[in-house]
Amino acid sequence: MELKKSPDGGWGWVIVFVSFFTQFLCYGSPLAVGVLYIEWLDAFGEGKGKTAWVGSLASGVGLLASPVCSLCVSSFGARPVTIFSGFMVAGGLMLSSFAPNIYFLFFSYGIVVGLGCGLLYTATVTITCLYFDDRRGLALGLISTGSSVGLFIYAALQRMLVEFYGLDGCLLIVGALALNILACGSLMRPLQSSDCPLPKKIAPEDLPDKYSIYNEKGKNLEENINILEKSYSSEEKCRTTLANGDWKQDSLLHKNPTVTHTKEPETYKKKVAEQTYFCKQLAKRKWQLYKNYCGETVALFKNKVFSALFIAILLFDIGGFPPSLLMEDVARSSNVKEEEFIMPLISIIGIMTAVGKLLLGILADFKWINTLYLYVATLIIMGLALCAIPFAKSYVTLALLSGILGFLTGNWSIFPYVTTKTVGIEKLAHAYGILMFFAGLGNSLGPPIVGWFYDWTQTYEIAFYFSGFCVLLGGFILLLAALPSWDTCNKQLPKPAPTTFLYKVASNV
């Protein structure tokens, strides 16, 4: 169905509002899971590493399943996926209130809620991109702050609900709030031409002659497949001879579709043999597409900046994600009294993440700022801030570090810019999908690793030194790969003839 031109406004602003609210509702609880993490530790008595799997799965599963989420949205549309995912998120949260043990939470909260969030994120971003072209950056920036605002509000909301209604009541109420996603999804009107008539089914006898005849030698493979997919609507008569039971096909002659079907078994065998041949060609084509995908993936990793970027995003999520999950428990382990809490530390991380997304996004638009180096700077500063957490023994210092970490976590808003500069716009979708997979892997592994360090040492010191080292290492690897001096050194060495699979982008970022 033909789509309208992106209106860059109008109903698009309704899409922005409901997408913002959708991300607010679905990501509020998973991102503020640190409040629930403390309650689960007390309720189930499991180790910190095992309990941390609940929150890490909720954040990582959606990213790990990003290719499946994209396929669902492209196949069914943003509105149905949003409504279905709203049921998943709400149902997973409500189901978690009846969890008898931590393993049940792995499924109900970690997998069900996490997968629902991944589907919702893909749906909101996709439909926003359809409605906006010139103002796409602004629209995406606005909806992306929904998750950060959700983190800010849900951290305080969940703490209050736990105090008044207990852990189970909190999850039931938060799940009920998530049902509002269904209303948001109903407003996600598909962008399609209102005056575009629905396609009519054509009777076989009314098909044009060009679909009744097929000359194998005059068509390329893609045309063969297209005609095969339209299927045959009429009998074809072949000039062939039967020799030793094998058919030797020269060409196909057109036969009027109104002619009655022949009863000769030879014609039936010819048709079966012909369609079998084209099915084999279709299978070969699909295999060729798979080989091309693998070849493009290998080509991406031949780009040293992209290879460094994938290592950096993996290490960043292993080390940078745990604070949003564990900071409340860090304060409790540092003997910070609850009376000193002016605002939950997770709320500070959330509001500063929203500020960081906006300010870093604005800085990335300045031509005199190198986006890749800006991203590297956020990684290095974040690594240093993580290493400073063990020295924070008061609410004020923990709040200050939480604000710094939250602001730097806003570098997610410039990550697509960095990816585009690294591989080019034509490779963005492929490259971004790979990077998001490794980001999900890091999100899933980071908090349990930090929790295991605590279970091993009974202190968060080594755990956050490890987190800071991971982020620092990722930043320095990316910095070294992007330095123009590396290209200068490589130019002095004999190099093979350039191919389409080699990219020199570091000096152009």
From Swiss-Prot:
Its main location: membrane. The chain crosses the membrane at residues 13-33, 53-73, 80-100, 102-122, 137-157, 164-184, 305-325, 342-362, 372-392, 398-418, 433-453, 462-482. The keyword Transmembrane helix applies. PROSITE patterns: MFS (PS50850). InterPro entries: MCT9, MFS, MFS_dom, MFS_trans_sf, Proton-linked_MCT. One of its GO terms (cellular component) is plasma membrane. One of its GO terms (molecular function) is creatine transmembrane transporter activity. One of its GO terms (biological process) is carnitine transmembrane transport. Residues 1-12, 483-509 are cytoplasmic. The keyword Plastid does not apply. It catalyses: creatine(in) = creatine(out); (R)-carnitine(in) = (R)-carnitine(out). It is found in: Cell membrane. Keywords: Cell membrane, Membrane, Symport, Transmembrane, Transmembrane helix, Transport. It is a multi-pass membrane protein. CDD domains: MFS_MCT9 (cd17428). Extracellular pH-and Na(+)-sensitive low-affinity creatine transporter. Also functions as a pH-independent carnitine efflux transporter. Belongs to the major facilitator superfamily. Monocarboxylate porter (TC 2.A.1.13) family. This is Monocarboxylate transporter 9. It comes from Pongo abelii (Sumatran orangutan). The lineage of its organism: Eukaryota, Metazoa, Chordata, Craniata, Vertebrata.
